[in-house]
């Protein structure tokens, strides 16, 4: 069966690589906003075994799909990087683990800085797919999901 990521990619196959990655990030936010990261998921993210398994899935499965999309972006001229595989792996690890307050506890200011750094990093290596709007939506979603754990109101 197709993964959710594969389905999203097939729905956006007429777009440039950059547009595809941006669309996937937006769809992922919409999906999470609707029903993702409930109490069960939040609890799991505190389990070292679950986090390791999640990181391995990011690198061993999801990164290949993202890398292929980056390669497409290189071919169509919308993205420029010499390291599509490594870029995909690092992006997924930082976005899904380092920027997840359930894994690495932080306040809203620190999370905002992490997201801005990730945006800067991706832009500096030629994969400028994190718009300011996307960052704000991500921050808003994470604040909504993790209000208690993260102590955003401090």
Where are these regions (language model features)?
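Hydrophobic alpha-helical connector segments
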Residues: 3-38, 88-91
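C-terminal peripheral helix-coil segments that are non-catalytic and often amphipathic
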Residues: 64, 68-71, 107-154
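Short, flexible helix-adjacent loops and helix caps
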Residues: 6-13, 37-43, 75, 100-107
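Hydrophobic/aromatic residues within well-ordered alpha-helical segments
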Residues: 1, 24-28, 58-62, 66, ...
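Hydrophobic alpha-helical bundle segments that form small-molecule/ligand-binding pockets
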Residues: 62-95, 99-106
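Phosphate/oxyanion-binding loops and surfaces in catalytic or ligand/nucleic-acid-binding neighborhoods
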Residues: 27-32, 57, 94-101, 124, ...
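Short secondary-structure transition hinges
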Residues: 33-78
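Helix-loop "lid/cap" segments that line or gate small-molecule binding pockets
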Residues: 25-32, 40-44, 116-126
